[in-house]
Curated annotation (Swiss-Prot):
PANTHER family: CYSTEINE--TRNA LIGASE, CYTOPLASMIC (PTHR10890:SF3), CYSTEINYL-TRNA SYNTHETASE (PTHR10890). This is Cysteine--tRNA ligase. The keyword Amino-acid biosynthesis does not apply. The gene is cysS. GO terms for cellular component: cytosol. Zn(2+) binds at C28, C213, H238, E242. Its cofactor is Zn(2+). Keywords: Aminoacyl-tRNA synthetase, ATP-binding, Cytoplasm, Ligase, Metal-binding, Nucleotide-binding, Protein biosynthesis, Zinc. Binds 1 zinc ion per subunit. The lineage of its organism: Bacteria, Pseudomonadati, Chlamydiota, Chlamydiia, Chlamydiales. One of its GO terms (biological process) is cysteinyl-tRNA aminoacylation. A motif ('KMSKS' region) lies at residues 270-274. Belongs to the class-I aminoacyl-tRNA synthetase family. It comes from Chlamydia muridarum (strain MoPn / Nigg).
Length: 475
C-alpha cells in the first residue's frame, strides 16, 4: 500500500518513493547537556512511529540518529562542572538510552557522536573555503556565506528580502530575525571554552552545531537521504543550514522528504523551568506513571498538531491502556472451545486491519488508527458477550477466533509499541486444575470448586468467574 507523507519542503502530502533499499533515515538526536525532556520525546516517539510504519509496510530502514556532545550548552556545562566534555556528557547519554528503552523506542542502526567526526568536519570546512563559500572572519571563526547558496530559505520558505540580515552570527541557535552567515568553526575562547578545543588549519576551536549533522549523516548514509526528521523548531536555522552546507559540498539534493513534529505544550503553555511545568521522563516515572502510559500519550495525537500534555491526559492514557490490557487478557483466556475461525470474526479483523493501514499510510494518522482499534475492540467484546457458555454450539466464540485476533494485535503493535501482552504462559498443571474446577462447577460441587481455586491461587495464579467462563491471570 502506498505511503503518503507531508513534506515540509514542498508543503504538500507526497507519495513516498525511496531512492533505494534500504530507506535512508536520519533523525536529530539529543544534545547531551542535560536529561531529555518530554518535549524532546514527543519528537522521538513521532520518529519511532515513522520508522515502525516503514518497517510494517515492508521497507528496510537504515536509521542514523546523532548525539550532539559538543556545542554551546555542553561546553558551558563541562566548564561549570570543571570536568572533561566526555565525562560531563556520558551520564546524560546513558540516561537517554535508558529512556529510549522505557518508551519502547526502536534503536537506530548508528548513534554517531559529533566529537568522533571532527577530522571530517575540518576537511569539509576547508573544502567550502576553497570554493569561496566559507570564509574566516575577523574573530578567526569560519562562516558560511548564505549569499553563495541561492536556494537558502527553501525549507523554511523564507523571503530573504523581507528579513533583516546581519553580517554573521556565531551562536548555535538563533531565530529568523537574525538571518545571517552562520558559523562552521567557532574560534577558541579560553574564557568561554576552558581547555576544550581542537586544532585545525583555521586555528584552535570547535565545529558549529549545524555542520555536525551534515557531516555525520553524509558519512553514514551517503550524500542524499530519503528522509530527515526532527522537531518543528529545527526547521530554521538548523535544517536550513544543513541543506546549505550539504548541497554545497556534494552538489546533490540533500534530502527528499523532510518531516517535522509540532510543539508539545504542558497545560496549554510552553514548557519552561520557570513556570514549573518542565518534565523529564524520570519525573513522570517517579509520579507513578509507566513508560507505556507516557508513550501512549505522546503517540496518540497527529505529529503535525500541537500536543497538550496534562496530568488528565496521562490518566486517560492509563485508562486506554487498561482497556487494551483487559481486552487482551480476555482473549488470552485458555478455555474458549476449539472451533473454526468464524466468518463474523474474520470479517471484523479484515475490516479493522484495512482501516488501520489506511490511517497510518495517510501521513501517519495515528489518532484515526487508534479510533479504529477501539471500534474493533467494542465489536469483538460484543461478540463474546453475546455467546452463551451453557450451550456448546458452532456459533460460540472459539479459541481459534481469540488466537486470530491476538495475532492481529501483535501485528499492529509493530506500529504502536504499547500493547500489554501477557509475559508468562499458564503452566499445564495449572490448566489441568482449572479444567477440573470447571467440571466441579458444572455439577455444582462447590466445595471441590473452592478447594481447586485455593490450589490454583497457591501456585501463583488468580481465577475469575464470569459469564463467558473462567479467566486465569498470574498474580
Amino acid at each position: 500500500m502506498d505511503l503518503f507523507l507531508y513534506n515540509t519542503l514542498s508543503r504538500e502530502k507526497e507519495r513516498f518513493l525511496p531512492s533505494n533499499d534500504p530507506v535512508k533515515l536520519y533523525t536529530c538526536g539529543p544534545t547531551v547537556y542535560d536529561y531529555a525532556h518530554i518535549g524532546n520525546f514527543r519528537t522521538y516517539v513521532f520518529e519511532d512511529l515513522l520508522k515502525r510504519v516503514l518497517l510494517f509496510l515492508g521497507y528496510s530502514v537504515h536509521h542514523v540518529m546523532n548525539i550532539t556532545d559538543v556545542d554551546d550548552k555542553t561546553l558551558a556545562g563541562a566548564r561549570k562542572k570543571g570536568c572533561s566534555l566526555e565525562k560531563y556528557c556520558q551520564p546524560y547519554i546513558n540516561a537517554f538510552f535508558a529512556d529510549l528503552e522505557t518508551l519502547h523506542i526502536l534503536k537506530a542502526d548508528a548513534y554517531p557522536h559529533a566529537t568522533h567526526y571532527i577530522p571530517q568536519m575540518i576537511e569539509a570546512i576547508q573544502q567550502l573555503i576553497d570554493q569561496g563559500i566559507a570564509y574566516v572572519g575577523q574573530d578567526q571563526s569560519v562562516y558560511f556565506s548564505i549569499s553563495r547558496f541561492p536556494n537558502y530559505g527553501s525549507l523554511s520558505h523564507l523571503n530573504l528580502e523581507e528579513l533583516r540580515q546581519s553580517s554573521r552570527i556565531d551562536a548555535d541557535e538563533y531565530d529568523k530575525d537574525n538571518l545571517c552567515d552562520f558559523v562552521l568553526w567557532k574560534a577558541y575562547d579560553p574564557n568561554r571554552d576552558g581547555e576544550i578545543f581542537w586544532e585545525s588549519p583555521f586555528g584552535k576551536g570547535r565545529p558549529g552545531w549545524h555542520l555536525e549533522c551534515s557531516i555525520m549523516s553524509m558519512a553514514l548514509l551517503g550524500q542524499s537521504l530519503d528522509i530527515h526528521a526532527g522537531g518543528v523548531d529545527n526547521i530554521f536555522p538548523h535544517h536550513e543550514n544543513e541543506i546549505a552546507q550539504s548541497e554545497s559540498l556534494s552538489r546533490k539534493p540533500f534530502v527528499r522528504y523532510w518531516l517535522h513534529s509540532h510543539h508539545l505544550l504542558v497545560d496549554g503553555k510552553k514548557m519552561s523551568k520557570s513556570l514549573g511545568n518542565f518534565f523529564t521522563l524520570r519525573d513522570l516515572l517517579q509520579q507513578g506513571f509507566s513508560g507505556e502510559e507516557v508513550r501512549y500519550l505522546l503517540l496518540q495525537g497527529h505529529y503535525r498538531t500541537q500536543l497538550n500534555f496534562t496530568q488528565e491526559g496521562l490518566q486517560a492514557a492509563r485508562q486506554s491502556l487498561k482497556r487494551l490490557r483487559d481486552f487482551i487478557s480476555r482473549l488470552e483466556d485458555p478455555f474458549y472451545p476449539d472451533d473454526i475461525i468464524h466468518p463474523e470474526v474474520g470479517s471484523a479483523c479484515q475490516n479493522f486491519l484495512e482501516a488501520f493501514v489506511t490511517s497510518i499510510t495517510n501521513d501517519l494518522n495515528i489518532s484515526s488508527a487508534l479510533a479504529s482499534l477501539f471500534d474493533f475492540i467494542r465489536k469483538i467484546n460484543g461478540m463474546i458477550d453475546r455467546q452463551s457458555i451453557q450451550e456448546e454450539t458452532s456459533s460460540e466464540f472459539s479459541k481459534q477466533d481469540a488466537q486470530h485476533i491476538l495475532s492481529l494485535l501483535r501485528q499492529i503493535d509493530q506500529v504502536l509499541g504499547v500493547l500489554p501482552f501477557s509475559q508468562a504462559d499458564i503452566p499445564e498443571d495449572v490448566l489441568l486444575l482449572v479444567k477440573e474446577r470447571e467440571a466441579a462447577r458444572k455439577v455444582k460441587n462447590w466445595k471441590e470448586a473452592d478447594r481447586l481455586r485455593d490450589e490454583i491461587i497457591s501456585r501463583g495464579f488468580a481465577i475469575e468467574d464470569g459469564k463467558t467462563g473462567m479467566k486465569v491471570k498470574k498474580i
